Amino acid sequence: MANYRGGRINEEFKREISNLIQNEVKDPRLTAMISVTDVKVTKDLRYAKVYVSIFSKDDEEKKNNLEALKNASGFIRKSVGQKINLRHTPEIIIELDDSINYGMHMDELIQRISKGNE
């Protein structure tokens, strides 16, 4: 039963944080497309790890966008706390998720190999 509740809380946080990043965080350093890929809230509801994927051409822009998100984590926590009714609002920890970039890289390698075999 608790596992089901944890999943609902994770999805609710993911939806709210995605909405906040897209519509309410007003930082000029946020220039790339940002997607929240996963949220994992601890069982005691003290911490929420937010995994984001940042789509940009260069690593410097990606680093600046991640830093801007980390600086906005206090605002995100406050806003999520106002929208989701919990006893404690978890501390937001933002992590970069490179799984999509890694998958695209692997797909590119597979396509190169298949073209070489033809």
From Swiss-Prot:
Keywords attached to this Swiss-Prot or TrEMBL record, sorted alphabetically, are: Cytoplasm, Ribosome biogenesis
Gene Ontology CC annotations of this record: cytosol
Q: Where in the cell is it found?
A: Cytoplasm
What highest taxon heads this organism's lineage? Answer: Bacteria
Q: Which residues form a coiled coil?
A: none
Q: Name one GO biological process term.
A: maturation of SSU-rRNA
InterPro entries under this entry? KH_dom-like_a/b, RbfA, RbfA_dom_sf, Ribosome-bd_factorA_CS
Q: What is its main location?
A: cytoplasm
The family database entries (PROSITE patterns) matched by this protein are listed as: RBFA
- Annotated Pfam families: RBFA
A molecular function GO annotation:
ribosomal small subunit binding
Quaternary structure, per UniProt, is: Monomer. Binds 30S ribosomal subunits, but not 50S ribosomal subunits or 70S ribosomes.
The UniProt family comment states:
Belongs to the RbfA family.
| Alphabetical list of PANTHER family matching this protein | RIBOSOME-BINDING FACTOR A, CHLOROPLASTIC-RELATED
Annotated NCBIfam families: rbfA (TIGR00082)
Query: What this chain does, per the record?
Result: One of several proteins that assist in the late maturation steps of the functional core of the 30S ribosomal subunit. Associates with free 30S ribosomal subunits (but not with 30S subunits that are part of 70S ribosomes or polysomes). Required for efficient processing of 16S rRNA. May interact with the 5'-terminal helix region of 16S rRNA.
Instruction: Identify this protein by name.
Output: Ribosome-binding factor A
Organism annotation:
Clostridium beijerinckii (strain ATCC 51743 / NCIMB 8052) (Clostridium acetobutylicum)
Taxonomic placement: Bacteria, Bacillati, Bacillota, Clostridia, Eubacteriales
